[in-house]
Curated annotation (Swiss-Prot):
It is a peripheral membrane protein. PANTHER family: RAN GTPASE-ACTIVATING PROTEIN 1, RAN GTPASE-ACTIVATING PROTEIN 2. LRR repeats lie at residues 213-236, 241-264, 269-296, 325-348, 353-380, 382-405, 410-433, 439-462, 467-494. GTPase activator for the nuclear Ras-related regulatory protein Ran, converting it to the putatively inactive GDP-bound state. Belongs to the RNA1 family. This is RAN GTPase-activating protein 2. Homodimer. Interacts with WIP1 and WIP2 through its WPP domain. Component of Ran complexes at least composed of WIT1 or WIT2, RANGAP1 or RANGAP2, and WIP1 or WIP2 or WIP3. Interacts with WIT1. Its main location: cytoplasm. Keywords: Cytoplasm, Cytoskeleton, GTPase activation, Leucine-rich repeat, Membrane, Nucleus, Repeat.
Length: 545
């Protein structure tokens, strides 16, 4: 039997930290009871009111948790036992301090705990305020002093808006190296502005080497004109990031080659939740590389690839890659050259999303076919859309009924932007009709520059002015008659702030096709009984259950 049974102890890895949310809540309740119930301590020092007890209990637990968590982060390979002990010790110490203060008036409850002894230590170090300027060695020595203090608790640093030279970078190097076990968020955006290329690249190398091996959750390298050379200068750091959750590479000159370098140098994207590539020259080939990063990021929630010169080929690649990102909440692809085919491809992806709240698809050349495919997909999806932007896509009245059906289905909608299209009166009235019932959260509508006349503007105004949460209607840049403008002002008489400026409206303007209504007939509609408006009001929105 002894040969069969191995009596040696087996190694189990049980993590004791962090405590679960229910555990933390239970501790807060116990602390509250210690303050307000009859105990030997409250008999000696006095008890607190229920409100005072609750307020202080929450504060004590939060401070103790923060202190213990910092301890745990310094020894990530441990089981968390020391953090648990520190958590309990801090709570006990702070509870006793509060009790010794004795009961005080409620107005002074926030001062029960000594600020010197329990205030959380500063965790965010930021030098970005003030004027944009070069920083050299001497100033860096003085500016970065707080980071050298023993036992500091900084987990987030921002060096943005200050241009580091070689001297300043060498001052920062050992300081950053000493902090890399505690840093979680690093913002190095716009930190080499105006430096010669060779110096800037060397500065990047220094920072990369200093931070290599950090357990960062967020890295911002935006506004540095990186290009491929800059991306590779940060190669050591990028390769070492195994827990990265947020990466920002905006306005960085990310070309095809730079995008390929990003894909190559970031091997671990399993935890990536936020990825921003706004305002780069990525193009279709670069988009293919970015698509590979997206494919490897199943937890991605927030993806921005706006103003990146991506055409149909790249748009289709990104759309297909996004199918792997079922947690997507915010998607921004504005200002690219997707076209109809990429729009249809994107619609297939959108139909599977369940958590999407913000969707920015303006200026993508979607046209009616792409727009209809997208809104039909959204209508059928479970996504609780709050923001929908499809401005500047050459959308005409042909797509209006599909858009209206989608909007009608999305009762969480907060903002709708359909500006710079060609929806005209008919499309505008369909949008107005679909939001007449419900949509209690709706705050902003932008239908500017849509060849809208008096009838469409009036229909929309009558609907939104009744919504309690509504804040702004933008219908500027249209062709509303002078009488129509006066009517709008009358509708918004009690709340003029809800109607945006009408400086760009052209009362004498004309539609660019042969189907326009004669302005004279429109003005003769009187109280809205004209034939056009009568027909529009009877339009139905086909909404499936």
């Amino acid at each position: 039997m002894a040969d069969i049974l191995d009596s040696r102890p087996h190694a189990f890895s049980i993590k004791l930290w962090p405590p679960s949310l229910p555990t933390r809540k239970a501790l807060i309740e116990r602390i509250t009871n210690n303050f307000s119930s009859k105990t030997i301590f409250t008999e000696k020092y006095g008890s607190l009111t229920k409100d005072q007890a609750t307020e202080n209990a929450k504060r004590i637990e939060d401070i103790a948790f923060s202190t213990a968590n910092q301890q745990f982060e310094r020894e990530p390979d441990g089981d968390g036992g020391s953090a648990v002990q520190l958590y309990a010790k801090e709570c006990s110490k702070l509870i006793l301090e509060v009790l010794k203060k004795g009961p005080v008036a409620k107005v002074a409850a926030r001062e029960l705990i000594s600020e010197d002894s329990v205030s959380p230590r500063e965790t965010f170090f930021d030098i970005s305020k003030g004027k944009r300027a070069f920083i050299e060695a001497e100033e860096a020595e003085e500016l970065l002093k707080p980071l050298k203090e023993p036992g500091n608790a900084y987990t987030k640093i921002c060096f943005s808006n200050r241009s580091f030279g070689l001297g300043a970078a060498r001052v920062a190097e050992p300081i950053l190296a000493s902090l890399k076990d505690q840093l979680k968020e690093v913002d190095l955006s716009d930190f080499v502005a105006g430096r010669p290329e060779l110096e800037a690249l060397e500065v990047m190398n220094i920072f990369s080497d200093a931070l290599q091996g950090s357990i960062l959750s967020s890295l911002n390298l935006s506004d540095n004109a990186l290009g491929e050379k800059g991306v590779r200068a940060f190669g050591a750091l990028l390769k070492s990031l195994s827990s990265l959750e947020e990466l920002y590479l905006m306005n960085d000159g990310i070309s095809k080659e730079a995008a390929q370098a990003v894909s190559e140098l970031i091997p671990s994207t399993e935890n990536l939740r936020v990825l921003h590539f706004h305002n780069n020259m990525t193009g279709d080939e670069g988009a293919l590389a970015i698509a590979e990063v997206v494919k490897r990021s199943p937890l991605l929630e927030n993806f921005r690839c706006s103003s990146t010169r991506v055409g149909s080929k790249g748009g289709i690649a990104l759309s297909e890659a996004l199918e792997h990102c079922t947690h997507m909440e915010k998607l921004d692809l504005r200002d690219n050259m997707f076209g109809t085919e990429a729009g249809v491809s994107l619609s297939k992806t959108l139909s599977s999303f369940k958590h999407m709240t913000e969707l920015y698809l303006s200026y993508l050349n979607l046209e009616d076919e792409g727009a209809i495919a997208i809104v039909n997909a959204l209508k059928e999806s479970a996504s609780p859309i709050e923001v929908l932007e499809m401005a500047g896509n050459d959308i005409t009245v042909e797509a209006a009924s599909a858009i209206a059906a989608c909007v009608a289905a999305k009762q969480d909608l907060n903002k709708l932007n359909l500006s710079e299209n060609e929806l005209k009166d008919e499309g505008c009235v369909q949008i107005a009709n679909c939001i007449e019932e419900g949509h209690s959260k709706l705050q902003y509508i932008d239908m500017s520059t849509n060849y809208i006349r008096r009838a469409g503007a009036r229909a929309l105004a009558h609907v939104v002015v009744k919504k309690e949460a509504f804040k702004l209607l933008n219908i500027d840049g249209n062709i509303i008659s002078e009488e129509g403008i006066e009517e709008l002002k009358e509708i918004f008489k009690k709340s003029p702030e809800l109607l945006g400026a009408l400086d760009e409206n052209d009362p004498d303007g004309e539609e660019d096709d042969d189907d326009e209504e004669d302005e004279e007939d429109e003005e003769n509609e009187g109280n809205g009984n004209g034939e056009l408006e009568s027909k529009l009001k009877n339009l139905e929105v086909n909404q499936e259950d």
